[in-house]
Amino acid sequence: SAIASMESGKSVIKQTKNLMDTLPSCVYFSKNKKGERSIRVGIKAKDSKYSDAIQALSKGEIGEEFGYIEFKREMGSDKTYSNENMAKPSYNPEELSAEVLKELKSLINDEVVNSVVITVPAMFIAIQKDATMKAARIAGFKQCILLQEPIAACMAYGLSAKKKDGRWLVFDFGGGTFDAALVKVEDGILSVFDTEGDNYLGGKNLDEVVVNQILWPHLKNEYYLRSYEQVEWKKKALIDALKGPAEEMRIALSFADSADYSTYDRNLNLGEDDNGEDIDLEITITKEKLLDAINDQYEKAVNICKDLLQRNNLAGNQLSSLILV
């Protein structure tokens, strides 16, 4: 997630406390030895979850509390989540999303912010949009306007586009969802005339593929992990601990032909295998190997775009712009 404000007629991204342009949409509940509860949001929450998985492995304390919950994918549902570290019995997806919005709001400290424009996937239905509005109210915003993400992308692109009018295809491969949208631009007016997507296709899925097809098989070849195969939550803790390395290497391979990772160099403990040997992840992944692994995920996105074009009797050469988000 990210937040921006208008300054001198320009949209300016507000950096996080870690000087990053984006904030992980992650919420973590903790409780110290005194029983005091707190909520961490963003990179601190994300790092804490990785640390939990690693600590669980190193101490042999495995339980069902270790794992990720993709609460943003459940917006508008009646799902609730609970654990012993929460200050109240349970949280729903809107309340968790509100914690992320509160953190983003805190990044603007030079003015009082009461109104917000929140972008949502084009595939969001009414109940999901209502849930987003509710999250904004919980976060303290008095006014909230929702804007479809393809429209937001087109608005940003259109500011510098040489050819304004025509039909644009927005290819929005996000962290957790994929949206394809056809946008008609005429006399400066943007309108989405058809959308298609997958609420369970995004960067997180790519990380899972890297873990399941590359990192996990690598460790199985190096260590004796039979008990991890037999105990569901033991394996889940190790898989969760590998998601950090997977994401780090995937991002690195966007700019390089190969990427190295070493838990030993980072002083990370992944526990022991069934023979009592320390588990260390020492691996080099090439861009070619990564692309081979994640190709099926991108094929899903491409096929969604093909179906969208076919449904509207359009061919690729009839598009004036392709916008990659």
Model-derived features with residue positions:
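Small-residue (GG/TT-enriched) beta-loop-alpha framework at ligand/catalytic clefts
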Residues: 137, 141-156, 168, 172-177, ...
